[in-house]
Amino acid sequence: MSELPQAGAARSGQDERRLVERVLGHWKKVAAGQRFPRLNEIDPWMVGDDWANCVVIAVQSPVELSYFTVVGENLAVALCTRDTLAGLLLSHLPPVLPARRCMIVEGEATLRGVPILYRAALLPLSDDGVAIDHVLGAANHRTLLADEPTMTRVVRKRWI
């Protein structure tokens, strides 16, 4: 997948161009290789302008009852069918919980009737360090060009 545009994304001295990699880097820094971060440790100020492309999902049982507690302004219009970025994030939530790992996912979708390529991250959070009670999500996209071959909604997943 070619690089997605990063209009308005804060670099904060970082060289990483990809939104999901920057947000993953923030999550890893807070986790310090030991545990899942707590919800109150995910500070929008630390994520910078990228926060506009993030969501926080309150995990429920069954997982289909999970819901958004925070939706960044660039994703707000997307609430919440599967052919939107926020809906795509929510649709990828079920395997993240039992795996207890971060997932990066990319693929093709439709956003407001326009074919897009997207990249997203789902990053578990836990107030007690054990039970995943929230998930931080980040997503961005670019429009699929008219002459660009489609991936027929192929989704690639990478577990962290």
Positions of predicted regions on the chain:
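Intrinsically disordered, low-complexity terminal regulatory regions
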Residues: M1-L79, G87-I160
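Short basic alpha-helical hairpin corresponding to helix-turn-helix/winged-helix-like nucleic-acid-binding
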Residues: D83
